[in-house]
């Protein structure tokens, strides 16, 4: 599996009050848009996305800008500064994964260094 192909999907995601509000208002379509945005952020450097780049995602999902904006700005799930956006929750859940990967990479480097001695 490529290094940027994994994203944890906690089964408790739907019990978060912000996500509950999203689903109650936007339905499963809104929930799907939320996860599509998380998937997009997952492959971005530092999990920070460019708002201008979302036009491609919008076309892929066949949604209107107004629907995308509701999910991005309406539920407190993303932090947007006008040019970029990120999900604090995604950063939080990826931290243990990144820490584990760093330990594995360090172990592999140490093992390779030991072989070269």
List the model feature ranges, each with a label.
Residues 1-111:
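Detector for short helical micro-motifs
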Residues 111-117:
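Charged, low-complexity alpha-helical linker segments
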């Amino acid at each position: 599996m490529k290094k940027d192909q994994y994203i944890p999907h906690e089964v408790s995601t739907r019990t978060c009050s912000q996500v509950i509000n999203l689903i109650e208002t936007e339905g499963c379509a809104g929930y799907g848009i939320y996860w599509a945005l998380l998937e997009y952020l997952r492959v971005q450097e530092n999990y920070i996305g460019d708002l201008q780049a979302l036009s491609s995602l919008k076309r892929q999902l066949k949604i209107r800008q107004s629907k995308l904006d509701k999910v991005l700005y309406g539920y407190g799930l993303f932090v947007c500064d006008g040019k970029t956006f990120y999900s604090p929750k995604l950063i939080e859940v990826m931290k243990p994964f990144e820490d584990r990967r760093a330990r594995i990479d360090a172990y592999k480097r140490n093992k390779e260094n030991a072989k070269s001695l």
